[in-house]
């Protein structure tokens, strides 16, 4: 039972690595731009005189700080999801133990 779980985890890990690496080989000379840049380009093609009606509340000082904030946001989100999944798994384990004692 445990060997099957380990094998499944290894296969899933290899699949994640494969899915992560394959785009670099498929699009060797591809330009990895952000969606904001693509949207701005599409809007200026439609209307060159377009002025945004909204401005950001906070503008980071540099691209590096913007990347840091984005990575921090992703890490916090992953932590919240991991905590939630761990909590649910622990809750299920406790419920299973309680149910086993009552049988």
Curated annotation (Swiss-Prot):
One of its GO terms (biological process) is cobalamin biosynthetic process. The chain crosses the membrane at residues 6-26, 68-88. GO terms for molecular function: cobalt ion transmembrane transporter activity. Keywords: Cell membrane, Cobalamin biosynthesis, Cobalt, Cobalt transport, Ion transport, Membrane, Transmembrane, Transmembrane helix, Transport. Pathway: Cofactor biosynthesis; adenosylcobalamin biosynthesis. It is a multi-pass membrane protein. The keyword Secreted does not apply. It is found in: Cell membrane. InterPro entries: CbiN. One of its GO terms (cellular component) is plasma membrane. Its main location: membrane. Forms an energy-coupling factor (ECF) transporter complex composed of an ATP-binding protein (A component, CbiO), a transmembrane protein (T component, CbiQ) and 2 possible substrate-capture proteins (S components, CbiM and CbiN) of unknown stoichimetry. Belongs to the CbiN family. Part of the energy-coupling factor (ECF) transporter complex CbiMNOQ involved in cobalt import. This is Cobalt transport protein CbiN. The lineage of its organism: Bacteria, Bacillati, Bacillota, Clostridia, Eubacteriales. The gene is cbiN.
């Amino acid at each position: 039972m445990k060997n099957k779980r380990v094998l499944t985890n290894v296969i899933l890990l290899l699949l994640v690595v494969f899915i992560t690496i394959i785009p670099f080989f498929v699009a060797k000379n591809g330009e990895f731009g952000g969606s904001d840049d693509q949207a701005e380009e599409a809007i200026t093609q439609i209307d060159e005189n377009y002025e945004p009606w909204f401005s950001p509340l906070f503008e980071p000082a540099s691209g590096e700080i913007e990347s840091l904030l984005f990575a921090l946001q992703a890490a916090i989100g992953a932590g919240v999801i991991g905590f939630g999944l761990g909590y649910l798994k622990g809750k299920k384990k406790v419920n299973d133990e309680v149910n086993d004692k009552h049988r």
